[in-house]
Amino acid sequence: MTNDMHVLEKEEVESDDFIQQPQAAETLFVNEFIDGILDPSQKMLGPLKDGGTIIANTTPGCWGPMLTPTIRGGHEVTKPVFVEGAEVGDAIVIKIKSIQVTSLATSSGHDEAIVDRFIGDPFVSVKCPGCGKLHPSTVVKGIGPHAIRCSTCDTETAPFKMTNGYTMALDHKGQMGVTVGREGARRIALDAKNYMRTPENSVQNPVVALAPSDLVGVLARMRPFLGQLGTTPSKAMPDSHNAGDFGSFLIGAPHEYAFTQEELDLHRTDGHMDISRVREGATIICPVKVPGGGVYIGDMHAMQGDGEIAGHTTDVAGIVQLQVKVLKKVALEGPILLPNVEDLPYTAKPFTKEEKRRARELAEEFGVKQVEDAFPVSVIGSGKTLNEATDNAISRAAKLFEMSEPEVLNRATITGSIEIGRHPGVVTATFQVPKTVLKKVRIYKTIKKQYD
């Protein structure tokens, strides 16, 4: 009888556990944000079905969070999503189905950190110069460069200032932006949240409240993309530092998120890329370093040239639709990008039937019996400098495809290109990879679907 009771109790517990398990969603709507720290120990949203869809209302990155000391990572990305079936050592394929800018205006510019307002890192550990509080709550009082004030002592608290800044109005058709003058910037600043369209759950101070207007009448074409898109690192870190360049700020840092170089290389997933080709139509294959992957999104930009050379571009709110798929037993050190064909380097674009025919004829003339059937792949690398980032991309590609680094260098030179994602240290190493190799590493079907 006692044994029967134990069995019954066990069955009841198992039954309760089963009931409490949330059912995986086919479509998940995301409008919640982290406090700037990507922490694998925190509960994720979801679960989402393998093959499911994420629709996210993202909030601006960079400047807004940088002006909000309670956000401890420099960005305000979405809470990570748990993808059903994703295990450590797998990969998650993310297809960007659509990106829509919702902001009507934004402000940006080149930054300079203010030395008495942070400890070690102005993105992570802000200190009020008045009352000395760490991560102080703030309010926006009025408009202009001194508008961000400590809630406790009313001291100006923003850890950054703009050395040259602008306010840009955005075309409602999503095609153009124009920088406005002093009066236009003032008009936008006085109705800041309405113009920025920050989601209701976002806590950032709107950057347009600063009303910068150093550039007036500058036209810019809109081509929105995601500066942050990826999976959760396996150790808690500030979201904007999830890459080898900004992540280097964490090495030996005087705050709780300090890393060694070895830890950074092991745990980061390079979700903060700022690669302008991560736009509608592109696919990215991301490493899974925690159970469920933890897909997160943010830092949408209205436009950007390669390098984001000013340090910041036009941060906007928007609506993003993604489709995710788990690739089992595809272990990656960092992301792989499959850009739209028009975004590929000339040398890496898929060959036409006519080009292949002519290549076969030339090969036969010199006794080459078979030419490669190959597809373009962009391997992302990051590091403290662009040189280190390039070395990282080449090293990752060599390990993944079981090639020597000199072979990768040759292939990237004649069938691809090294392109800057972000200065100082994110690049893509793009080159044509043989179909046989892609099949061996289990990513051929994903790449064929993108380019076939």
Predicted regions and their residues:
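N-terminal, charged/glycine-rich beta-strand/loop interface patches
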Residues: 2-276, 287, 291, 348-351, ...
